[in-house]
Amino acid sequence: RDRLGTGQWFRDYYLLPLSGAIWSTPTQNILDFPAAAMMQFFENHALLNYSGQHQWYTVNGGSIQYVTRLERELKISGVEIRIKAPVTSVQRDAGKVTITCQGGLPEIYDEVVFATHSDDSLRLLPDASKEESKLLSAIRYQSNDVVLHADTSVMPRLKQCWSSWVYTEDKHKTSDKIDLTYWMNSLQPIPKEDPLFVTLNCTRNIREDLI
């Protein structure tokens, strides 16, 4: 900011809110992000333009389309998919790996690939090495309160200001969490006469009857 001469307004009312919305991260923590990686992300997603609308695409029919296609192809390839079988532990022994699922018996495999968050991976490893514990515990996560609702009061008073993502910050901010609303009718093919919003960490009251 100082080197480019963009000023505090650019930092506080564009860079930090937009970045906080993208990563659901408190704005004050955005300044800890590596600047080069952040700017590369902005460039890759065409977010460095200061005029016009950003072009975004969604999958027709929603993400269920590629999930079902991937599932079909995996099954054709002979992959067994198990649902409702959460893994509770992954134990290594004598070059093999023993997996235990909730309500099931231990099963032995040659190798295991973790496709989970780092903290979940660490929790599943009772015999994690010192290096594994250090690496897997180094990543921090931000918990967020999420509400699906139909209360339009969380959106700007002027409807022409409604956007797919709406960032809100109270003048006398008391929380370190970001207040963000996704306008689902804009993001997905949901009829506009059935307004739906997803709000993270709302600092205002959402009507109970609209949740």
Please give the residue ranges for each predicted region.
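Mid-domain catalytic core of redox enzymes
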Residues: 86-211
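Active-site/ligand-binding neighborhood in enzyme catalytic cores
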Residues: 1-89
